[in-house]
Amino acid sequence: MKIGFIGLGIMGRPMAKNLLKAGYDVTVDSHSPAAAAELEACGAKVADQPTIGSTCDLVLTMLPNAPQVKQVMLGANGVAAHMQLGSTFIDMTSLNPIASKEIAAELAARGIQMLDAPVSGGEPKAIDGTLSFMVGGEEE
C-alpha cells in the first residue's frame, strides 16, 4: 500500500515517521521544505499534492483547519482530482462535523471514501505512536 501524507507539523511529522518505521511506503508533502527533507532522510518520497493523489492508495492529512483541508483536497488542482476511483482519504484534522460531511460528500461523488479521524494525545503520543483515534465514516 502506498500512503500519501500531507501536513508535517508538530503532529504530522512524527506520525509520518512512525509509518516509515513500520515499513510503509510513504510519500509526503509539506509547506515546510525542512520538514519534507527531514522525512526524506527517513526514507519517505517527497512529491507535490497532485502526484500524491495519482500515486497513493491512501491519502492522510493532518492540517490545522477545515479551509486548509478543503483547499488541499478540493481546491484547484487538489489531491482529489488526481485520486483513483475507490481510493481512501483519512483526515486527522479536528474538523467540525459540517465541514467533514461536506468534504466527504464531495469525495463520495468522485468515488473516494473518506474517514474522519481526529486524534487525541498531543505531540508526545504522536512521537511514541500511541495516539487515540476517533474514527467516523461510512460503515462499509
PLM region spans:
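NAD(P)+-binding Rossmann beta1-loop-alpha1 motif at the extreme N-terminus of oxidoreductases
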Residues: 1-61, 87, 123-126
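Rossmann-fold dinucleotide-binding core
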Residues: 3, 95-140
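Alpha-helix N-cap/helix-start capping motif
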Residues: 9, 33, 63-66, 97, ...
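Short, glycine/charged-enriched secondary-structure capping and boundary segments
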Residues: 18-21, 41-43, 73-76, 103-107, ...
